[in-house]
Amino acid sequence: MRPQDSTGVAELQEPGLPLTDDAPPGATEEPAAAEAAGAPDRGRCWLCLSSPCCSRTEPEAKKKAPCPGLGLFYTLLSAFLFSVGSLFVKKVQDVHAVEISAFRCVFQMLVVIPCLIYRKTGFIGPKGQRIFLILRGVLGSTAMMLIYYAYQTMSLADATVITFSSPVFTSIFAWICLKEKYSPWDALFTVFTITGVILIVRPPFLFGSDTSGMEESYSGHLKGTFAAIGSAVFAASTLVILRKMGKSVDYFLSIWYYVVLGLVESVIILSVLGEWSLPYCGLDRLFLIFIGLFGLGGQIFITKALQIEKAGPVAIMKTMDVVFAFIFQIIFFNNVPTWWTVGGALCVVASNVGAAIRKWYQSSK
């Protein structure tokens, strides 16, 4: 799922990991996707639906698609799958968001273990990169938990749009930690994103006490907002760490740390909160399986899109996450977004598209 289940896209994106240079924005769900296009080739893998494996060298990863627009189609399909996964998270109201994260970690672990064994990369990683792998795992899984909580406590469209603020934090963190340039254009996109988030949150000191269009109380809306912003911050931190590690760490090893530490973190949090519960037979258990399946499918297709298409067009097409979130909110929850939400979404999407076009233009020089 999006995170960029945050990817770690952000997280497999987590929901909402952004694409600034080499990873798509918003999706949560899935931060390791950006890394996939640059990891070393180790052989063939069934997970990627093609051969050779998704972890390929950079020159190979950018080869032309078999047919024009295939990479954009993969991106659109990925956005749809992540959005459907988010819908199922919203539907599972009787299971805590952290427990949903734990189930997804277990599901992904069952997929990653045979891949690591097949690729013979080990389960620990290079000595000098282990601290970064640990940070990537903790921050990425935290981003996933927070976005799942946001999905459960506020409208699907609002939570999705706010997670698309992640590229703003990525630019700032990269400027501070990696000494990357922070240009006036980045500052302008930051202003657009902040404006969009304010329009969605509608703080009372600016908009009064009007809460029309919110499917929950304002306190619940505010909790979801903080969770979504927190998810965007942690997803951005994860992407900066992935950039720091570069291509020295195998793609699946990065995911391995994410799912293992995410599961440990989930167990600790659930034990402290006393929120352990066995999902009811029937739809809830089916939804949990679908969350894992659609999150995995979304990650596979965003990875393949980044292999055969430039990052800029992928980032622009990835904004379809927001469109699907609006459609699902109207169809499945009978909740028509307000004009404030639409205006906020346009500001955030415009910021993401502008940043993607600028990066695309710079890379084509």
Swiss-Prot record:
May play a role in intracellular calcium sensing and homeostasis. May act as a negative regulator of plasma membrane calcium-transporting ATPases preventing calcium efflux from the cell. The keyword Glycoprotein does not apply. It comes from Homo sapiens (Human). This is Solute carrier family 35 member G1. Residues 1-33 are annotated as: Disordered. Residues 23-33 have a biased composition (Low complexity). It holds the Pfam family EamA. GO terms for cellular component: endoplasmic reticulum membrane; plasma membrane. It is a multi-pass membrane protein. GO terms for biological process: calcium ion export across plasma membrane; regulation of cytosolic calcium ion concentration. It is found in: Cell membrane; Endoplasmic reticulum membrane. It comes from the Eukaryota.
